């Protein structure tokens, strides 16, 4: 009655959010299932470990010229990630340097590609990957790659490359910056983002509720290719920022 405080037998408890409650996590789950299905359909001898970086020369031929909307969306996404600290500002600035170089690439079949252009490819789920390429020592390499959900603009992967020692001392994002990356994906309300315990990841957040993992890393690599029949290589660094699904059992410890 009015003015009396009574104990409720079964007080309301808000349901714990799960991955199924979030569009982008449902999309990532479907993407993972598709990738697993494709791997199962390949001959066993061609299966390899996951690549540490994105190969360029094997992928450009499967892409098409990006229209201005896709190129602008990827550029804006990188700028916003740089503003929040989720992507190092210097890396984003170099990746988005749009000064025309006149560089081009001609593949083994004689097909010409302008490297002043942006390229993209879209999968059947609507994830669009936008990339820019460059040349180093006459070999093609990936300058940056951004994968977004085309319906929402949510970024799930950003990968950038920088030459040698310019990138060696890049600081990794703060926890606040990684939380901003979760927020742009609409996942802040999962409510339990935290650095995974006893994890080899130097910079990561994990949500048990969503089974979602955000990681950021930098690492040196040697880019290798061929110019004609002559091997060429270039020492570079990559920066990788990803949102992916992982159960607690799948977290490395």
Say what each PLM segment does.
Residues 1-253:
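Long, terminal "pre-/pro-" and other extracytoplasmic accessory regions
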